[in-house]
């Protein structure tokens, strides 16, 4: 392919440039996207499957090369390897943006790789990666139903900003990443400072204008240079197979839906599927195992949809706006700093809050440098929560994504470090799951913070909304269960306070939803959120007045930055001695702010005394209770402050004559001395005699 390029101007100094034909020419699709000096390369490749499967094997991997910012990794291994949490989250953003664009029953193994090759420290690469991955797929042979593009939207000084720079984003009240087609939204994810539903909708509408502009340009490029799509990789489901399977299960599944019981429904569904397979599968015909199973899933979905559409009743008997029963128990665990057992229907979280000093902060490294998060939430989803056997080990992409969403939802209500100097860790242990476990993590996590005595600004609750889009009729569901998530068209999670929204995430399975549907979903989510917040505040209306007696005590000190080296000492020797002698943990930052944490006040006071001794300045005329460090024939050397020593001459030891210094004081004795003077060399002249007057 010859070199081809086009550009899309979004705003002043924000022009997207797409290039292909120069790099990775053996890839099925390869595109380099540039904005200023941030360049992101994306490739798309597909392989035929050795056997047909009932899911889409689609994999996205995003990687930020440290060399793109003129750096190398600070770790022992300098080669990029295991993806960071940030890279996993952006990989998920790209995946969730593109997955709805593929045809049903596409039998190809698809891989998209995105690399940040140049980073200018201003232009953020994630929206470029979404657009580049979409463009690479668009010009490849991989079939797609629609063209996709993505942008970031910020709210800076009351104005909407497309693809805000890093500095603009730092000042923004909103961080929204969204993707869609020229006419509809496919994916949104963001967090904000208590924006209203109307403001969130306005932000989405603002971003959609730029998405449409980019989509139109990519589509024109595809028509001009794109490869012919391999439509043979898309399997049709014969209509007669669907009809036969639907008729086979209709009566029995309809009866199962009337049970209003999850376990009974799952058992009947399992037995029905086994019966369908045993009676209808005929290999080497249209009634293959793959076709029959696909038809069975469609039939189940259609009957569930019909129940909601025609009767307004869901599979568990709830109305479309009804929320499952909620139970809450705070201080659930006796020795933790804060805990909550939060149960909503058959979804349950044991949330735990742990408080600590600066050393407990979560360290990270990315293209912008090193950092430490003083608040983080970690989500755990063991296989027993859904009654299964599975792998236990490092977290998967789903766990990382769910944890980060809940973390963002709660981060906006945390107090400033100057008011509450603790590092805060929340863990959400999912012990039961039937939909909306990430939002249970928000609710349980919030209550665990309050139980731990963290002075949050306001309680936060979360709810997941679903959608049944059938025969041009859109039905929004509140607090969706697992089967509604699996068979429905949308999963729209919204978290916030009574004042406004703090975090949101939407994934859909159809080609896009309209502004009106999102408006209805957000309005319904607000009602549900208020209901949950009311139940939460009935149990705990405000945070505990003080932290748990099992939590460490933390105090801060401010020293002059010129004294930092003195406190740390050569090779960290001095600060290690302070920690050993006091039993407290001592952390100091580049601004001279010292955090001292310990289990007892005595340890904190001791550490403060040692630090004040190191950083304090000696004063002429002041009396010190010093320590004799050595005895010589002409006097005694006395340490008045840590590292500050002076001579008390033999003539200054007593009002009476002293013949032998060793008869008067010994090394290690405490001796009150007065600082008489400091000479031009900085030497201290001390007197014990002067303290006797």
Swiss-Prot record:
Domain (KH): residue spans on this chain: 552-611
Record-listed Mg(2+) binding positions: 485, 491
Keywords of the record: Cytoplasm, Magnesium, Metal-binding, Nucleotidyltransferase, RNA-binding, Transferase
Catalytic activity of the protein: RNA(n+1) + phosphate = RNA(n) + a ribonucleoside 5'-diphosphate
Keyword Ribosomal protein: no
Pfam families in the cross-refs: KH_1, PNPase, RNase_PH, RNase_PH_C, S1
Gene Ontology cellular-component annotations: cytosol
Superkingdom of the organism of origin: Bacteria
Annotated S1 motif domain residues: 621-689
Compartments reported by the entry: Cytoplasm
Enzyme class: transferase
Main location: cytoplasm
Gene Ontology biological process terms from the UniProt entry: mRNA catabolic process; RNA processing
Coiled coil start-end: none
A GO MF label: RNA binding
Entry-linked HAMAP family: PNPase
Function text: Involved in mRNA degradation. Catalyzes the phosphorolysis of single-stranded polyribonucleotides processively in the 3'- to 5'-direction.
NCBIfam families: polynuc_phos (TIGR03591), PRK11824.1 (NF008805)
Family, as annotated: Belongs to the polyribonucleotide nucleotidyltransferase family.
Name of this chain's protein: Polyribonucleotide nucleotidyltransferase
Species annotation: Chlamydia muridarum (strain MoPn / Nigg)
